[in-house]
Amino acid sequence: MKLTPKELDKLMLHYAGELARKRKEKGIKLNYVEAVALISAHIMEEARAGKKTAAELMQEGRTLLKPDDVMDGVASMIHEVGIEAMFPDGTKLVTVHTPIEASGKLVPGELFLKNEDITINEGKKAVSVKVKNVGDRPVQIGSHFHFFEVNRCLDFDREKTFGKRLDIASGTAVRFEPGEEKSVELIDIGGSRRIFGFNALVDRQADNESKKIALHRAKERGFHGAKSDDNYVKTIKE
């Protein structure tokens, strides 16, 4: 008997599903893998029998297991189960959403938030900087990008922004349309303040000496708003 990799996978899934069913019958609470295998194997068998539609199996898949049939936390881990099943008229994807109803118990890793506003970057001193996009394309800056090194077509006092980032929620951004001018709030970058990457204007500890070097580099490379002493010469030792 020669089986394709897909057929071998289905055979393994059937075996896992049967094992899970037997354990369920013995009153053993199922883990994540066993729960998914039981639901998937049942759907495959019913689809092969050809007496139920894909829509019917989607609904039936939600009735196979109850919260008491699985270990604590498993129900909340399974948001959906998708299985490609063979029906008489061909292969169809059967997706069962929320296959196990919530038990009402605490979920591992669950967070309980206070019903009040959260103050971001509390206690950090912010500075306001006016920025203008003198380029012909929109520029979007992420919350933790070193603002000193943003797109060269943004014109602002770069020296004032050295070692700082946007004072906005993590993962959000500020967008500047072509020709747009607006003020943004900036705060100091935290941690060890070793700044690497971005536009490679710093690549070292963010201190007063590295600021002079970064301003010199920015001016040489055409970053708007970068002003440095033309007589300043510094040999960078790598």
Curated annotation (Swiss-Prot):
Disulfide bridge partners, by residue number: none
Highest taxon, organism lineage: Bacteria
Region (Urease gamma): 1-102
Region (Urease beta): 103-238
Enzyme class label: hydrolase
Catalyzed reactions: urea + 2 H2O + H(+) = hydrogencarbonate + 2 NH4(+)
Keywords on record: Cytoplasm, Hydrolase
GO biological process: urea catabolic process
Gene Ontology molecular function terms on file: nickel cation binding; urease activity
Record CDD domains: Urease_beta, Urease_gamma
GO cellular component: urease complex
EC number: 3.5.1.5
Entry-linked Pfam families: Urease_beta (PF00699), Urease_gamma (PF00547)
Pathway where it operates: Nitrogen metabolism; urea degradation; CO(2) and NH(3) from urea (urease route): step 1/1
Signal peptide (residue range): none
Places the protein is found: Cytoplasm
Similarity field: In the N-terminal section; belongs to the urease gamma subunit family. In the C-terminal section; belongs to the urease beta subunit family.
Complexes and interactors: Heterohexamer of 3 UreA (alpha) and 3 UreB (beta) subunits.
Protein name: Urease subunit alpha
Source species of the chain: Helicobacter pylori (strain Shi470)
